[in-house]
Amino acid sequence: MNLINIIENSQKKSNITKLFSGDIVKINIWVLEGNKKRIQIFEGIIIAIKNKGISSSITVRKISNGEGVERMFPLHSPIIESIIVNRHSLVRKSKLYYLRNKKGRSSRIKQRLKK
């Protein structure tokens, strides 16, 4: 087997939930402040997913104090404690970059109902 594949497989997390564009997620992240370590929660909508093996990442957008905040998270990073899916949304595109230009109620996305 290829040496790179062996190293990548040892670094991959196996407990990652299935994520889709448009999902509202809550990501718990380990943050270092001085010599203390705590968990910070980042909650928002997934606007992009890049699946590239161990370097897979998601882009999450939230509105904080009226300003849009986007953050990219590598899925297999050790700073991510957990990813919790709060809600699935009904979208027809894989990249939701058009949400950057929307404000208020126009930026809302319909919820996907389970059958």
UniProtKB/Swiss-Prot annotation:
PROSITE patterns the record matches: RIBOSOMAL_L19
GO MF term (any one): structural constituent of ribosome
GO cellular component: ribonucleoprotein complex; ribosome
Source taxon at top rank: Bacteria
InterPro entries per UniProt: Ribosomal_bL19, Ribosomal_bL19_CS, Ribosomal_bL19_sf, Translation_prot_SH3-like_sf
Ribonucleoprotein among keywords: yes
Disulfide bonds: none
An individual GO BP term: translation
Keywords recorded for this protein, A-Z: Ribonucleoprotein, Ribosomal protein
Summary of the function given for this chain in its UniProt record: This protein is located at the 30S-50S ribosomal subunit interface and may play a role in the structure and function of the aminoacyl-tRNA binding site.
Family the UniProt entry places it in: Belongs to the bacterial ribosomal protein bL19 family.
Name of this chain's protein: Large ribosomal subunit protein bL19
